[in-house]
Design a protein with these regions (language model features):
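Alpha-helix-loop-beta-strand connector modules within alpha/beta enzyme cores
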Residues: 9, 212-225
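Loop-centered beta-sheet repeat module
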Residues: 43-84
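An alpha-helical appendage that flanks or caps ligand/catalytic pockets
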Residues: 4-39, 81-192
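Flexible loop/turn segments at secondary-structure boundaries
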Residues: 60, 80-81, 113-116, 202-206
Length: 225
């Protein structure tokens, strides 16, 4: 399924959520059909929980903003220039549709805190491996068996400069505690309302837990309202 087809399906199914929360809603669309249905249990919130739409292109932003939903963006493997570009798309979309006032923006990227260069390199390498595999999935050119991608060789990973550990260190929120704090502050200064950590990587579960504990203990208090 290409991105356009996937996007059309998303545009049809997401609006049904709010109607299912209201209850007794039937749907006869192009892609989805179901009889009168109700979401049980119903949400505690009056109009249901907030809906966040992952968006990168202007059309997806407009879909979210015109429905008064929030927007989550990610620069993927890219850095601050891409983050700024995405925030500008969000801001321009909000200006285009000023009547829709209840919009928040969230920025998602990979993050890792190291106590020294060895630990930082470890985090950057793990994220590098993640994006090499991420990119291979989207190329759709490797064999998949039992839901697992045919493994990349180390040579293939080493030859992909775009996803190198050096690029990950530069473009992702990976570094010392102070560097990570400074980066989150930079995202805040751009106008993002929320920051989200993309924790999926090739780090072990214990390394992820240790990092998350550091972030909760040492970074989040710097941004408490």
């Amino acid at each position: 399924m290409d991105a356009m087809e996937a996007g059309m399906r998303m545009r049809e199914i997401v609006p049904t959520l709010e109607k299912l929360w209201q209850g007794d809603y039937s749907h006869q669309g192009k892609y989805f059909q179901f009889p009168s249905s109700t979401s049980i249990p119903k949400p505690l919130q009056k109009n249901g929980p907030p809906i966040w739409i992952a968006a990168r292109d202007p059309n997806s932003h407009e879909f979210a903003v015109t429905n008064n939903w929030h927007v989550q963006v990610t620069p993927l493997w890219k850095g601050l220039d891409e983050i700024t570009r995405l925030k500008n798309i969000f801001d321009d979309t909000c200006k285009k549709f000023p009547k829709n006032t209840n919009r928040l923006s969230m920025m998602l990227n990979h993050c890792y805190i190291g106590n020294n260069e060895t630990e930082i390199e470890k985090g950057a390498t793990a994220v590098s491996k993640f994006y090499n595999n991420f990119g291979a999935w989207f190329k759709n050119s490797r064999k998949v068996v039992q839901g697992t991608l045919d493994p990349l060789t180390q040579e293939e990973i080493d030859n992909n400069e775009m996803y190198s550990p050096k690029e990950m260190r530069k473009n992702q929120n990976i570094g010392t505690l102070q560097e990570v704090i400074d980066n989150v502050k930079r995202y805040e200064d751009l106008g993002f309302d929320e920051y989200s950590i993309w924790i999926d990587s090739h780090l072990s579960i214990d390394d992820k837990k240790d990092f998350l504990d550091k972030f909760i203990t040492d970074v989040m208090p710097k941004f408490s309202s």
